[in-house]
UniProtKB/Swiss-Prot annotation:
It comes from Chloroflexus aurantiacus (strain ATCC 29366 / DSM 635 / J-10-fl). The gene is groEL2. GO terms for cellular component: GroEL-GroES complex. GO terms for biological process: chaperone cofactor-dependent protein refolding; protein refolding; response to heat. Together with its co-chaperonin GroES, plays an essential role in assisting protein folding. The GroEL-GroES system forms a nano-cage that allows encapsulation of the non-native substrate proteins and provides a physical environment optimized to promote and accelerate protein folding. This is Chaperonin GroEL 2.
Length: 545
């Protein structure tokens, strides 16, 4: 296919046009006094959003050369969202500021490769300074403040603080669309997996359509149980112990084995419940091992030379309660050894750090949460569908920001952490003039998020930046900054205006990375448009038959 090419200043001008177009749409959403953006959908109601990455993902320009600039800048927002889950607008604002200042230097004759080298050196120093500023997240109030700032909603902040209190910092929180007009949350006590009872005959509470066992024995196996001879020894052992409650977790239970369990349940001889094992393949084996450790049992598997008929009471797990409906089973307060459970959690956390797959990481985090007994569901409601989707996006941002804050700590918000990092550039050693120029570009760009926050609040950005510096000198306190909601200069940490260090760091790293790519681009290549076909009527065949 034929290609179109443009070079040098013409290429950089096209990139700049695309970058400025995207940034203009995204940066209007920055801060608590930023505006919303409405996104048209081909079907359904339009989406109204305050989320920078949602706006960025929607933008495609007709001009293919300018669109390359859009796609490059979009990477700063998307990558920041992937790593930290928030801070996408900050990344876009920083990247645009670095690119615009850098392009002026390139147009004046500066070497782009040396500029990039200076940006990379400065970036390393700035990231180190941001990490130095970070304070470990300790109190419930700090968690609430992080969530409130990210969602720009005090109710969301309070709810997330409450949920994190109850499920712990290793817990899993999922966000769903609710059916009411307000926020709701559910806490799942114990380990839940998405397999329900095999037969409705196991139900003990017909009003709730649930099967409930108190202090049951738990048989865990990865094989299919069809023959009664496989189950008979363990059934006799359970009954001889004086207990009647038994949970069977297996690949499947059918045939005479299922019939025997159901008949004994109906006669009242045995209060049994059979459920299928969760997951598939290797993940199933791992999850069965999790259940065994949680309940103090053993997985009966032919892979380790154990047959089902050889199982004894010592191989069975125990729990305070088991509850199952047609879709889910919950094991509450397993009797497993606490040290073994903690060792398993530590092992899973190690796997989380080493895995490169986002899907595997998510599944591992779920397993950690289930072992530590913390899973919560937040249901987001609103009067209309667009409002509900917009609020759900903000709740997800707040959740990601809270997790990031737990991970790497917190820094002063309102763009002040970046402002406070600027002196770190004074200690960077440079070899070439362009490297020194790049450090000056960063000095100017790091002020831009604060300028934009002030601009969105209707203030003069440059005046606010200068006033913040004066207030910091006056109070000898680097935590002073501008509260855009009240229009006053306050100690941001005391006022609860804080950002996760991971979010600020990721935004800066990705902005510098994208800016370096743009500044060192000398040629653009895109597909040439195909010539339009003429709308003539095709000739008719001869009627000679």
């Amino acid at each position: 296919m034929a290609k179109q090419l443009i070079f040098d200043q013409q290429a950089r001008t096209a990139l700049k046009h695309g970058i400025d177009t995207l940034a203009l749409a995204v940066k209007t959403t920055l801060g608590p006094r930023g505006r919303n953006v409405a996104l048209d959908k081909k079907w359904g109601a339009p989406t109204v959003t305050h989320d920078g990455v949602s706006v960025a993902k929607e933008i495609e320009l007709k001009d293919p050369f300018a669109n390359l600039g859009v796609q490059l800048l979009k990477q700063a927002a998307v990558k920041t969202n992937d790593v930290a889950g928030d801070g996408t607008t900050t990344a876009t604002v920083l990247a645009q500021a670095i690119i615009n200042e850098g392009l002026k230097l390139v147009a004046a004759g500066a070497n782009p490769m040396l500029l990039k080298r200076g940006l990379d050196k400065g970036g390393q120093a700035l990231v180190a300074r941001i990490k130095e500023q970070a304070i470990t997240l300790k109190t419930r109030d700090e968690i609430r403040n992080v969530a409130t700032i990210s969602a720009q909603d005090a109710e969301v902040g309070e709810l997330l603080a409450t949920v994190m209190d109850k499920i712990g910092r290793d817990g899993v929180v999922t966000v769903e669309e609710g059916k009411s007009t307000h926020l709701e949350h559910e806490l799942v006590e114990g380990m839940q997996f998405d397999r329900g009872y095999i037969s409705p005959y196991f139900i003990t509470d017909s009003a709730r359509m649930e099967a409930v066992l108190d202090e049951p024995y738990i048989l865990i196996t990865d094989k299919k149980i069809s023959a009664i001879k496989d189950l008979l020894p363990i059934l006799e052992a359970v009954l001889s112990s004086g207990k009647k409650d038994l949970l069977v977790i297996a690949e499947d239970v059918d045939g005479e084995a299922l019939a025997t369990l159901v008949v004994n349940k109906l006669r009242g001889t045995l209060n049994a419940l059979a459920v299928k094992a969760p997951g598939f393949g290797d993940r199933r084996k791992a999850m069965l091992q999790d259940i065994a450790i949680l309940t103090g049992g053993t997985v009966i598997s032919e892979e380790i030379g154990r047959k089902l008929e050889s199982a004894t009471l010592q191989d069975l797990g125990r729990a305070r309660r088991v509850k199952a409906d047609k879709d889910n089973t919950v094991i509450v307060e397993g009797h497993g050894d606490k040290q073994a459970i903690q060792a398993r959690i530590a092992q899973l956390k190690q796997q989380i750090e080493t895995t490169t797959s986002d899907y595997d990481r998510e599944k591992l985090q779920e397993r950690v949460a289930k072992l530590s007994g913390g899973v919560a569901v937040i249901k987001v409601g609103a009067p209309t569908e667009p409002a509900m989707k917009e609020r759900k996006a903000r709740v997800e941002d707040a959740l990601n920001a809270t997790r990031a804050a737990v991970e790497e700590g917190i820094v002063p918000g309102g763009g002040v952490a970046l402002l406070n990092a600027i002196p770190a550039l004074d200690n960077v050693t440079t070899q070439f003039e362009e490297e020194r120029m790049a450090l000056n570009v960063l000095r100017r760009a790091l002020e831009e998020p604060l300028r934009q926050l002030a601009t969105n609040a209707g203030e003069d950005g440059s005046v606010v930046v200068e006033n913040v510096r004066n207030e910091q000198r006056k109070h000898n306190n680097n935590h002073y900054g501008y509260d855009v909601m009240t229009g006053t200069y306050v100690d941001l940490m005391q006022a609860g205006i804080i950002d996760p260090a991971k979010v600020v760091r990721s935004a800066l790293e990705n902005a510098i990375s994208v800016a370096g790519m743009v500044l060192t681009t000398e040629a653009l290549i895109v597909d040439a448009p195909e010539p339009k076909k003429k709308n003539g009527t095709p000739p008719m065949p001869d009627d000679d038959f």
